[in-house]
Amino acid sequence: MSETKKTRKLRPLPLAFTRWLFSVHRRLFKDADRNYENNRSLEAPDMGFIYGQAVCPQFTLGKKKMAGVGCEIAATYNALRLLGKDASFAEILRDYEKAGYVMRGFVQGDMGTDPFSIGDFLKAHGTDCVSYTNYDALASVMAEYKNSREVYILSFWNRGTVFGGLHTVAAYTSPDDGKLHVFNRYNNSTKEAVFSSLGDYVPKNRFVVGYRLLAP
């Protein structure tokens, strides 16, 4: 989903409940191939990174458009590109739909994609990763490797209640400055956002799950 600039304090939900909440809304999408044909026609060969999900081609996820629900797909696409891998956005989106990782509330895709499915998706497509549901453990790893080129995917609540949805981004640490560089901070972003650390960007009480992608 997209992130807005209005945030409030949120008491963390129990991990088991959060996983259940996402899993019960996952659905297979029978029109994935039809979406793929449309999405492929929108994807330029030189599309590059997605800096904001509302300022890129408006691909279709389930029955919804990219701007409101496409952050997990954008994060996966950006992260794979950060690893130097060839990545087709249309193919990634189709494969998430076919795997049943896209969520449905009232219509297919209106709840985005289950963030806990990202690790399974990456591994099924040849990219190893380490998943973190413990915020402190992830923050420690990111601090330890801040001066290395490391690629991450981060999911977190983006408003004061679960009903405001969550946001998922790709990020990397740079040996040039030791900072965290984030793609798609807001859905209308046009460049990377830079933070000193995980804690500078994502508060502990909003964290859902994170992934450290391992280079081939």
At which residue positions do the language-model features occur?
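Conserved active-site-adjacent core of cysteine acyl-enzyme catalytic domains
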Residues: 81, 86, 91-215
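Active-site-adjacent structural segments surrounding the nucleophilic cysteine of cysteine proteases
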Residues: 2-107
